């Protein structure tokens, strides 16, 4: 159970479309708040106007004293490479916290397997066990299998952690 509320944030550019995008963002957040309350999850929402999206996220992160960021990836057919380069660099440089970027294309309750590619020497990074715990908890809640791919040394640590902390996860 959560001990504090989730924060749902929508950041819109301060441009000529700001009013329209602000209204759309508020409508989206209202829907999200309704879904959260149906699941008995406390949530606060905010539509923030910013000249720089990454800065808008960073400022909200600090104001709400958030512990991590879960960010949805948009569904545009083409993703501009320069957007990801500058945006992620700006966001990562401003925060030393876990940032999860996800693009969920199907309902979560239909997922039967999670495939995880672990970068080389990831076990030496801060937050290694934190994201591992998040994935194991998600696999347990979804009752699906989880498969890890990486170096043997890392996989031994992962398997030991899962076996000791989440014995029901397969």
Predicted feature locations:
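Solvent-exposed alpha-helical segments within well-ordered globular domains of core cellular machineries
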Residues: 30-34, 55-62, 89, 133
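Intrinsically disordered or low-complexity boundary/linker segments at protein termini
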Residues: 1, 67-160, 165-169
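Conserved beta-strand scaffold positions in the cores of enzyme catalytic domains, especially
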Residues: 8, 45-46, 99-101, 170
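Short, surface-exposed amphipathic charged segments that create phosphate/polyanion-binding patches used
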Residues: 24, 59-63, 114-116
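Conserved phosphate/pyrophosphate-binding and hydrolysis machinery centered on Walker-type P-loop NTPases
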Residues: 22, 47-51, 81
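Short, internal active-site loops enriched in acidic
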Residues: 13-15, 51-53, 153-155
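Structural beta-alpha unit
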Residues: 38-69, 165-170
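Non-transmembrane accessory domains of multi-pass membrane transporters/channels
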Residues: 1-46, 121-126, 130, 135, ...
């Amino acid at each position: 159970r959560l001990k504090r509320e989730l924060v749902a944030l929508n950041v819109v550019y301060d441009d000529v479309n700001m009013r329209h995008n602000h209204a759309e963002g508020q409508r989206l957040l209202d829907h999200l708040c309704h879904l959260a309350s149906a699941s008995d999850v406390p949530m606060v929402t905010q539509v923030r106007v910013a000249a720089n999206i990454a800065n808008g996220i960073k400022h909200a992160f600090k104001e709400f004293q958030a512990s991590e960021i879960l960010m949805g990836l948009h569904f545009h057919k083409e993703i501009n490479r320069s957007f990801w380069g500058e945006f992620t660099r700006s966001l990562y440089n401003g925060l030393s916290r876990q940032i999860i970027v996800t693009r969920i294309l199907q309902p979560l309750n239909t997922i039967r397997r999670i495939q995880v590619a672990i970068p080389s020497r990831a076990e030496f990074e801060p937050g290694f066990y934190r994201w591992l715990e998040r994935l194991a908890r998600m696999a347990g809640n979804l009752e699906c299998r989880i498969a890890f791919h990486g170096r043997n040394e890392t996989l031994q640590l992962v398997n030991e952690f899962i076996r000791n902390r989440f014995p029901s996860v397969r």
